[in-house]
Amino acid sequence: MVDMGALDNLIANMTYLQARDGDSRELRRQHQSLVLPGPQDCAELHRELTPDFHSLCQQQPIGRRLFRDFLATVPSYQVAADFLEEVCSWELADPGSGHGLALQALLVPVSSHPFPSPALATRCQAATTEEELAALVVLAKAEATAFLQDQPLRDFLASPFYDKSLQGKLLERQPVCDKDFTEFRLLGRGGFGEVCAVQGKNTGKMYACKKLDKKRLKKRGGEKMALLEKEVLERVSSPFIVSLACAFQTRSHFCLVMSLMAGGDLKFHIYCVGERGLSPSRVVFYAAQMACGLLHLHSLGILYRDLKPKDVLLDDGGSCRLSDLGLAVHIQDDKPITQRAGTSGYMAPEILMEKVSYSYPVDWFAMGCSIYEMVAGRTPFRDYKEQVSKEDLRQRTLKEEVSFQHGDFTNDTKDICRLLLAEKPEQRLGSREKSDNPRKHPFFKSINFPHLEAGLVEPPICAGPFGEVLPKICDGAVPIAWQEEIIETGLFEELSDPNRCTFFSSSSSSCSSASVVWFLLFFCFV
């Protein structure tokens, strides 16, 4: 007897995987239907916008690309742009025997460039030590950036390149609705709705769509929380936090379209893949990315309040991002807050105490809990599958010392957990002083953070939906069976007919999808 539930799941999986492969012909047709607004339509937008160099020319991808294209048309501007790119490459280069020589080669021609001040040009010629040269690179970088913000920016704003960026901005501002996306399989459910995979019709890119039920939000007073999450996601711009692509509403739902993280959450990897816990290299890598995400939120005055492995998602490549910012809150003028929020087992002592205010240190406490859980396969104050009341868990958090019985706890791991799980916020790593940065702890000695932020550090594992297994299973036809099939069906004779009319069609993606179907059928019905 056929399991119809499994069949539905099979069809959803098949369609989802086909969408991930993409249909280039359909995308080409969709692209041909898109038209940029005309320059004459941008007059009102031109008056409305006040261009900001950092936002327009550095943060926004289209503006950055068009500004770079414009600079390439003026040799003196191109020199400054090339210098900044060379500085960026030098900053990301591994320190070694050639690092000082590269630094010298970077600064020697600076005196002939159009952007440095006479004083800086003189100092560049006179500098001899590596320390002097490194300090001068910082100054030269600042002067090159200031140079580009002056006349080059004014010329860019008067050029057709800026008009093109306005056309892109006007296209970006067009209304978004559910008809702009194709909805695929359900990914998960939550208290206010569900998350499903969707595909943008214009680009073919896959996203996760968080659909919040309006009735549930109204009934449970969740409107402000949903709005706050949307506002927080709009502000963040970090490779370590899920990004918001757009937001729209239907008659029944508010929809947030965000990064699709197909590798599962850390909780799944800790408890459901192999033995409980993660390897030391994975623990350090994920903790480093979590620390970068928290520091970005804190730099924007945002308190996360709900860091835990379940809300840390992995992408196809194996990197992780913080997600589910529904409990995040803006801290106004560094004023602490008192409202209790978070998940039991990850909340800091100051959250659990009555009428005690708290601030950023609570996020570092939750990170300590998460590191402990990744190593030990259990939380610091509750054993695996142990049934504990919220009050007992609260008392344990307030009173008990954390023990490190698991064999994978190294001295550095124990130390960072103790510092992050310190009872008093002022003694907690990341909060002891303004310059207290958890990334400087020896636990992270193997991580090059500039490389990590630039996406140059290889993740310990690839966490795609099937990893390396699916290509090995779905590797094509078995020779004898395939040859028997085309002979028995008469296809071989038809293909061998010299008078047969033929046409070429690229169908590699459909073949790969067919293999996936049989792979899924095996697990559903065998």
Segments from the language model and where they lie:
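A short, aromatic-enriched beta-strand patch in the conserved N-lobe beta-sheet
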Residues: C246-A247
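Activation segment signature within eukaryotic-like protein kinase domains
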Residues: Y286-A287
